[in-house]
Amino acid sequence: MIKKIGVLTSGGDAPGMNAAIRGVVRAALTEGLEVMGIYDGYLGLYEDRMVQLDRYSVSDMINRGGTFLGSARFPEFRDENIRAVAIENLKKRGIDALVVIGGDGSYMGAKRLTEIGFPCIGLPGTIDNDIKGTDYTIGYFTALGTVVEAIDRLRDTSSSHQRISIVEVMGRYCGDLTLAAAIAGGCEFIVVPEVEFNREDLVAEIKAGIAKGKKHAIVAITEHMCDVDELAHFIEKETGRETRATVLGHIQRGGSPVPYDRILASRMGAYAIDLLLEGHGGRCVGIQNEQLVHHDIIDAIENMKRPFKSDWMECAKKLY
């Protein structure tokens, strides 16, 4: 029977992580469980840096960006000896189960703990929206608003100078954030990992737009696709139009979470406690068609596929 749980945030931070922690803590306390907060993700778990959390520990947290528990990347957690120390720390603290909030790297850590018999629940916290088994991740909608606002501002100056602007958006190897922001921001061209990219084809499309009378354009591109400064230089050379690249960077991860992210995080946090009390471990939480769902975390990582929104891409092309 579960009496005490731990909660940690891991990997890149996302707006709404604090709301998720709050959801976990308050739901657990309501059910009579104790909660230990673990600082700095798996690193803090390995180093045994924890704190007991009560209702007041998470007061005034629902609207705050970032994560008050801190986060860190800790690739050393792949080492079974490191994980053995982490498990020993959990047992020493009397922790019976763990809630992990983060992206796919965080899920891998939870998967490894699950494989050696420690109950874990994963909550999808990442702006990339690249987690399998869920329509949306905690932080995605806040980041989307941040990116669209940046695109709106870039359009103002691009229009003034009749310039081509390239905006690089986070997402790692998933184009969801780029695609949604590009549609909402009215971008003329979209470059995402799921669709084959050729810079000569992009230039041809830009030239076609210029021939139709377009005075400026915005190209939205997912990070890691190419060097955007080099791409800007190439476009300017081929089109004769001034072209500048803007890398939005970590500003996309910050800021107060929008209402949907707060609600999603709160619901998922409370749902994680429901699952643990029902005897579920080794699960990851998602939302599909606005209904909370849970999947086997090992199956989700190893077997599930995340479909690309090809219909969104087709829509975007019609709006160029």
Swiss-Prot record:
Known EC number: 2.7.1.11
Pfam families: PFK
Location in or out of the cell: Cytoplasm
Main EC class the enzyme belongs to: transferase
PROSITE patterns from the UniProt entry: PHOSPHOFRUCTOKINASE (PS00433)
Key words, A-Z: Allosteric enzyme, ATP-binding, Cytoplasm, Glycolysis, Kinase, Magnesium, Metal-binding, Nucleotide-binding, Transferase
One Gene Ontology term of the molecular function aspect: 6-phosphofructokinase activity
A Gene Ontology term for the protein's cellular component: 6-phosphofructokinase complex
Catalytic activity: beta-D-fructose 6-phosphate + ATP = beta-D-fructose 1,6-bisphosphate + ADP + H(+)
Binding site for substrate: 126-128, 163, 170-172, 223, 244, 250-253
Record pathway: Carbohydrate degradation; glycolysis; D-glyceraldehyde 3-phosphate and glycerone phosphate from D-glucose: step 3/4
HAMAP family named among the record's database cross-references: Phosphofructokinase_I_B1 (MF_00339)
Protein name: ATP-dependent 6-phosphofructokinase
